[in-house]
Amino acid sequence: MSVITRFAPSPTGFLHIGGARTALFNWLYAKHHGGKMLLRIEDTDRERSTDAAVKAIINGLHWIGLSYDGDPISQFERTERHREVAEQLVKDGKAYYCYASPEELAEMRESARAEGRPPHYDGHWRDRDISEAPKGIKPVIRIKAPKEGATIVRDRVQGDVLFPNKDLDDFIILRSDGTPTYMLAVVVDDHDMGITHIIRGDDHLTNAARQTIIFNAMGWKIPVMAHIPLIHGEDGAKLSKRHGALGVDAYRAMGYLPAALRNYLVRLGWSHGNDEIISTEDMISWFDIDDINKGAARLDFKKLNAINGHYIRMSTDQDLFDSTLSILPEIESGLEIIDKLDKKHRAQFLAAIPHIKERSKTLLELIDGASFIFTKQPLLLDEKAKMLLNEDGQAILKSIYPILESCSYWDTNTLDEALRHYAQKQELKFGTIAQPLRAALTGRATSPGVFDVLVLLGRNESLNRINQQINTTKCS
């Protein structure tokens, strides 16, 4: 059997991080079996569905590195097919027209509540003849759900889940305006698309029971189902805005690499031994829905940062440079940095990357670590830098300025030799010199190695910054 999975988002907003993991699991399972993953846009809610959201979903999938087969399928464009199936179910005696008015339905619900029953439709039109239909009322179509026993959802993650049929009632499959409900549209589309495996969030389990009833009514084979646990926040609560970023686009703007996010997401609910860093090739080779956990996975930014830091260290400098440039328009002060990135500063930034990527967990930290290159002048000092540039620090700068100025070559070896010789001669620890020098060059107490900074900035810029601090720093 050829495996065909599908990712079926609703285009009402960005690609949610939970949706990205669902897409990843579908993609991996299809790839593992040499099959296909299709993309279906569930856009039947015309009021909330937008073209911008469709674009955001497709862009999000592309960025995170998940491809789909064929063109995206619009559920809305298949409305006529959904209506055709609903009418066929009526002809086959598996569904019926219901003419109940809103007032009658409200009365049914009130009676059910008063009697302590679930507020379900009571099947009033289930066996009535159409000749009894009132004039001027457009009917809905309801499925004839089984009244006795239970509907069983056979799930590869959750096991067999039983739903008493008395709790499911004769639900609507076609509205009075001729539009299908979600339940019907999903079943028809999954059948027509040849979907063999449905991998989605476990919040769809109850839907799965109702969809099973429709599959059985049509005599169609039910795809293998795997309902995966939702992603929760670090506090164990359902993921929401208060837990931080929700959309894939936000993670991109926060400086996460797509390979790192894939690696992190695959470990949310699935694992392969104790492996933390997993290549895409190994994911495809190892992934199986039978290994997905039942319990909800918790979002852990510390772990995500650690994984992202690994991928940053393993990336080439050019790739990091390109990735960083691509997110600048999306981050705070990014446009200011773009304005300053002339040919000279681009070269300096690229040259700085090997010196700062070892300590960077995100691209934002990489940008921050290189900010001394394109910072505004006069240089703004952080509090620690101000402390380092006190009276003693200024005295150091005044002493080493002529030494640096007299260096015949501006390379790390020459600069290292000159300053260490001075420190030894003055019986000073090298850190006593390096700390105020670093503060004068970068405005911070931490940075890449001070000799690397000197070389990156170049002779003139370095001497100008040192001289500027000698002349302007106030003792605190």
Curated annotation (Swiss-Prot):
InterPro entries according to UniProt: aa-tRNA-synth_I_cd-bd, aa-tRNA-synth_I_codon-bd_sub2, aa-tRNA-synth_I_CS, aa_tRNA-synth_I_cd-bd_sf, Glu-tRNA-ligase_bac/mito, Glu/Gln-tRNA-synth, Glu/Gln-tRNA-synth_Ib_cat-dom, GluQ/Sye
One GO MF term attached to the UniProt entry: zinc ion binding
Motif 'HIGH' region, chain ranges: 9-19
Listed EC numbers: 6.1.1.17
Keyword annotations from UniProtKB, A to Z: Aminoacyl-tRNA synthetase, ATP-binding, Cytoplasm, Ligase, Nucleotide-binding, Protein biosynthesis
Chain positions of motif 'KMSKS' region: 238-242
GO biological process, one term: glutamyl-tRNA aminoacylation
Main location: cytoplasm
Superkingdom of origin: Bacteria
Record localization: Cytoplasm
Catalytic activity annotation: tRNA(Glu) + L-glutamate + ATP = L-glutamyl-tRNA(Glu) + AMP + diphosphate
UniProt keyword Signal present: no
PANTHER family registered for this protein in UniProt: GLUTAMATE--TRNA LIGASE (PTHR43311), GLUTAMATE--TRNA LIGASE, MITOCHONDRIAL-RELATED (PTHR43311:SF2)
Job description of the protein: Catalyzes the attachment of glutamate to tRNA(Glu) in a two-step reaction: glutamate is first activated by ATP to form Glu-AMP and then transferred to the acceptor end of tRNA(Glu).
Similarity comment: family membership: Belongs to the class-I aminoacyl-tRNA synthetase family. Glutamate--tRNA ligase type 1 subfamily.
Assembly mode: Monomer.
Name assigned to this protein: Glutamate--tRNA ligase 1
Gene name for this UniProt entry: gltX1
